[in-house]
């Protein structure tokens, strides 16, 4: 089955701080992304807000607890809750992270990188296929930021990500900030990372901020998108074309209007990158 990219435009994450504004007016963005786990409980204000928002603009679900790379069995309870939420909300798509965050039945509430080995690749692909079978739809997997690497890795991260998407017949949620953060932390070329990815598999982009700790960059989602990430996003657009793009801001969350400004800037950067590309192609 081929992966079908759906273009939604430029959106923002749905955060509790902005619930009142979302209830009062139609969201001033093209679409919103909701953290799946925050809306799995039946009833309550969060779900009521999400149901209202989905009547106004498209919604996608983004999970943080699937732990697709863990050696623990997939949580059937979690998949059941996600299936129920999917049936209720009918999101444009569902995504999670290409990582692991649980072991021995305990969740660390963190997103740890995988060893990039053939064994890990086969393991992850089997689990993605199972999740897609349960959900009845393709999944998008996001590249995570990382600060350590496994000596056992047999291939670079970008090759692993591309091969996961090919073998599992799933999509890629390309987090441009995570590419930049990991590139700085591990010393690889972020532009070479982009060049190795299959364009047809990329279904969504994340943009976010990070903190410079001197010796390393920390993916905080607590600042505006920095210049270097905007530059990498422009290259992403030139290489892959228009892709649904979301602004992530999870810490020190500003007013909704500030997120909307960042989303509009993403639209401007995208338009400029495409215009420059077209201009360069003219005789």
Curated annotation (Swiss-Prot):
Q: Which family does it belong to?
A: Belongs to the UPF0276 family.
**NCBIfam families with a match to the protein in the record:** PRK05409.1
This protein's name = UPF0276 protein Anae109_1558
HAMAP family (alphabetical):
UPF0276
Q: SUPFAM superfamilies attached here?
A: Xylose isomerase-like
**Matching InterPro entries, A to Z?**
MbnB/TglH/ChrH, Xyl_isomerase-like_sf
């Amino acid at each position: 089955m081929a992966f079908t990219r759906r273009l939604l435009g430029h959106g923002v994450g749905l955060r509790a701080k902005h619930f009142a504004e979302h209830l009062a007016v139609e969201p001033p963005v093209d679409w919103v992304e909701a953290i799946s786990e925050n809306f799995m409980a039946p009833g309550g204000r969060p779900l009521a807000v999400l149901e209202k928002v989905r009547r106004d603009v498209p919604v996608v679900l983004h999970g943080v607890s699937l732990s697709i790379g863990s050696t623990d069995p997939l949580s059937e309870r979690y998949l059941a809750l996600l299936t129920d939420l999917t049936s209720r909300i009918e999101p444009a798509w569902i995504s999670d992270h290409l990582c692991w965050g649980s072991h021995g039945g305990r969740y660390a509430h963190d997103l740890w990188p995988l060893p990039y080995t053939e064994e890990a690749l086969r393991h992850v692909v089997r689990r993605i296929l199972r999740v897609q079978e349960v959900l009845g739809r393709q999944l998008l997997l996001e590249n995570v930021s990382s600060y350590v690497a496994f000596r056992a890795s047999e291939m670079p991260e970008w090759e692993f990500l591309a091969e996961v998407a090919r073998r599992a017949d799933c999509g890629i949620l390309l987090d441009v900030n995570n590419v930049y953060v990991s590139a700085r932390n591990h010393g690889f070329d972020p532009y070479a990372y982009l060049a190795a990815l299959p364009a047809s598999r990329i279904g969504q982009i994340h943009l976010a901020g990070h903190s410079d700790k001197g010796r390393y960059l920390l993916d905080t989602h607590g600042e505006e998108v920095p210049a270097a990430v905007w530059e990498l996003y422009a290259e992403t657009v030139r290489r892959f074309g228009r892709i649904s793009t979301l602004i992530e801001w999870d810490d020190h969350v500003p007013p909704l209007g500030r997120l909307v400004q960042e989303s509009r800037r993403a639209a401007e950067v995208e338009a400029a990158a495409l215009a420059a590309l077209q201009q360069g192609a003219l005789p």
